[in-house]
Swiss-Prot record:
<dbReference type="InterPro" id="IPR001357">
    <property type="entry name" value="BRCT_dom"/>
</dbReference>
<keyword id="KW-0436">Ligase</keyword>
<feature type="domain" description="BRCT">
    <location>
        <begin position="592"/>
        <end position="670"/>
    </location>
</feature>
<protein>
    <recommendedName>
        <fullName>DNA ligase</fullName>
        <ecNumber>6.5.1.2</ecNumber>
    </recommendedName>
</protein>
<comment type="similarity">
    <text>Belongs to the NAD-dependent DNA ligase family. LigA subfamily.</text>
</comment>
<keyword id="KW-0520">NAD</keyword>
<dbReference type="GO" id="GO:0006281">
    <property type="term" value="P:DNA repair"/>
</dbReference>
<dbReference type="GO" id="GO:0006260">
    <property type="term" value="P:DNA replication"/>
</dbReference>
<feature type="binding site">
    <location>
        <position position="412"/>
    </location>
    <ligand>
        <name>Zn(2+)</name>
    </ligand>
</feature>
<keyword id="KW-0227">DNA damage</keyword>
<dbReference type="InterPro" id="IPR012340">
    <property type="entry name" value="NA-bd_OB-fold"/>
</dbReference>
<dbReference type="InterPro" id="IPR010994">
    <property type="entry name" value="RuvA_2-like"/>
</dbReference>
<dbReference type="Pfam" id="PF01653">
    <property type="entry name" value="DNA_ligase_aden"/>
</dbReference>
<feature type="binding site">
    <location>
        <position position="409"/>
    </location>
    <ligand>
        <name>Zn(2+)</name>
    </ligand>
</feature>
<dbReference type="InterPro" id="IPR036420">
    <property type="entry name" value="BRCT_dom_sf"/>
</dbReference>
<keyword id="KW-0479">Metal-binding</keyword>
<dbReference type="GO" id="GO:0003677">
    <property type="term" value="F:DNA binding"/>
</dbReference>
Amino acid sequence: MTNIQTQLDNLRKTLRQYEYEYHVLDNPSVPDSEYDRLFHQLKALELEHPEFLTSDSPTQRVGAKPLSGFSQIRHEIPMLSLDNAFSDAEFNAFVKRIEDRLILLPKPLTFCCEPKLDGLAVSILYVNGELTQAATRGDGTTGEDITANIRTIRNVPLQLLTDNPPARLEVRGEVFMPHAGFERLNKYALEHNEKTFANPRNAAAGSLRQLDPNITSKRPLVLNAYGIGIAEGIDLPTTHYDRLQWLKSIGIPVNPEIRLCNGADEVLGFYRDIQNKRSSLGYDIDGTVLKINDIALQNELGFISKAPRWAIAYKFPAQEELTLLNDVEFQVGRTGAITPVAKLEPVFVAGVTVSNATLHNGDEIERLNIAIGDTVVIRRAGDVIPQIIGVLHERRPDNAKPIIFPTNCPVCDSQIIRIEGEAVARCTGGLFCAAQRKEALKHFVSRKAMDIDGVGGKLIEQLVDRELIHTPADLFKLDLTTLTRLERMGAKSAENALNSLENAKSTTLDRFIFALGIREVGEATALNLANHFKTLDALKDANLEELQQVPDVGEVVANRIFIFWREAHNVAVVEDLIAQGVHWETVEVKEASENLFKDKTVVLTGTLTQMGRNEAKALLQQLGAKVSGSVSSKTDFVIAGDGAGSKLAKAQELNITVLTEEEFLAQITR
């Protein structure tokens, strides 16, 4: 072997190791810049010496010419589907069938439990360690040849990370698109006037079925393996879990949430844990897959029809359903935004009954081409507000009514205008409009603003309807006699409300700024403003140029803030609030350059008592930290509040520095 060949082999081996650390172990040993440097060095050497180019080189992920169509590949071992369970009773019946069928029943039965990824099932064949073929599941017997596209996925190794590869190994797994990548893809599409994707699964499917692999290479796809098909020239581990860990050891990525569970109760606990974590995973799942772990028991149980007897998919409640649009109401928000709200025939979606859904704005009504009486598709995912994502136009009845966007406010009859360039139409009534007054006051007392527990939306509606309050400052002028005259307001409830109002007078500057309801000023921006200007007077007196020096404050937001303080009514309300005793302590936060958290990955867990989770997150981000939702070997700090659970345990297991809330505050303040 020549020196050049040796150099090329060493570079390829090193790059494969770095790819394995990054994509499979989630624990890179070198910065991205070092990987990029070696990658470009390898690419340059291969250009100089094309005679030594190999198809499994890290540089050869993209290179195939666009296809005219996909050829068919017949699966040597069929890719079967799974039976489904939709309740604990159905899962327990599945376990009972297994127990009745097994001759020697182990106690307890051990299951390998996995999230059910919402992507596309694929088969990837390695011959002597090199990726040679990939196919979609298709109908389970025959799929489409997507080899060129699979090669472009960054976490799929082109060469297995082992010196003794099997003669033939078929890896089966799911290709999906994480939420962050999906959002970037759609953002790019919008900026370039291209068609957006409805959801990550559609995006993954469309990306895998591109005839041009160069397009697929630009899509943020990920593979997680869930099993093995063909295996020749290798003695595989005797349990499903150990097989997945073996795949991981040779460079194949598997899902980090996989868990072994003993007995049905532990399995159901896993199901509920994953269901609770669903919205924070960063990718779509639609249930769990539960498999008997012992391969010998799998073989004894065998198959029925087109599904194995030893596995089942326990699905989450449906996130999409069909229902009827009965009417549309137009609601007025605290900034005057007019939002059309669909009134639906009640339907059970993702564990709750849905009867309302947002239609966002007039553009959305036009885009959906929706009418009253239509059959619509409702989607509810995690904590997301239910929304209409489609209309079955072929079912439109003859008596369907068009949705007419109002020209005057449905509450105060003021004119509705839509500023050019904005999607939202707004009522021009301002605080003359009772709806805007109510929503502004609800925002003021909300948990992330002034956090006034004893004063809720129903109470505010009564107070506004009876014209007992007009501004936030009026809340602090309420007395026991006034409150006890209201409906459903006894002496005890009235006292609680007054105590909450008194306690709320002591707040923080960022909470106070957020509570004022300045358009475009969210929690993070309010925190940045408070930390930049330090005092309310400095913020009030700031000009446009000074405002734009604050992180995340651009021209539009600066204008909103500047105009707010030029309105005499707003200044009068703020002065009245301070006159009523609203106050805060000045806390100076260290600059990013001199704090412990700059360029570090931080995880928050438990209940923080001195500030909200969102406040702490925004503060850490301002200090230059990356705030993550899960603990891994890349985590630098875990900030643990009261009741910290599994994240704290994992941090201790990985020897990650854990700070209490008090230690965190001591680090960030002068």
